[in-house]
A protein has these predicted regions:
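Aromatic-rich beta-strand edge motifs centered on tyrosine
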Residues: 51-56, 82, 128-132, 152-154
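Bacterial N-terminal signal peptides that target proteins for export
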Residues: 1-9
Length: 160
């Protein structure tokens, strides 16, 4: 009986923590690809591309990407990977400030994630995965045709 009375406060505290908004946010964040967080860069001759992703927090990861040639910017976009109120995960892309397009998640593993929207013109499929220390990205049509691929290396921020 005494053990039960002593255990009761711990059980109540655990129940309150699991029902707290912080615990709910942590559960949402766990559904996001935290392994993508960081600053990533690719250079191939004069062509360059980079992506920046925030840590998963509050059920969302924010991203920004840009590509260019030499000193000229060719394209840019803002992106989000977020957990929607129904618990599903989607990728949202806004190329050059245009309205956002949604790509629901269709596949997820420890080091890969894929989003698809067959009704979008191009891309229809967006895939990210880790290959060792590289962040790989690919966009294509839903059947995998017209694929474009990037292999990003992580940029380490300067130390103070």
């Amino acid at each position: 009986m005494l053990k039960t009375l002593l255990a009761a406060p711990a059980l109540i505290a655990a129940a309150l923590m699991s029902a707290s908004p912080l615990a709910a946010a942590d559960a949402r964040d766990a559904r996001l690809p935290g392994w993508m967080a960081g600053t990533w860069m690719m250079e191939d001759g004069a062509e360059w591309s980079d992506e920046l992703w925030t840590d998963a927090r509050g059920g969302i990861m924010l991203g920004v990407a840009r590509t260019g040639f030499g000193s000229q910017l060719q394209s840019w976009e803002t992106t989000q990977i977020r957990v929607k109120p129904d618990g599903s995960v989607s990728f949202f892309a806004q190329p050059q400030g245009k309205p956002a397009s949604e790509f629901p998640m269709v596949l997820r593993s420890e080091e890969a994630i894929e989003f698809a929207n067959a009704n979008h013109d191009y891309p229809q499929r967006i895939r990210y995965w880790r290959q060792g220390k590289l962040l790989m990205a690919e966009i294509s049509r839903i059947d995998g045709s017209d694929a474009q691929r990037w292999n990003y290396r992580q940029v380490v921020p300067p130390q103070d």
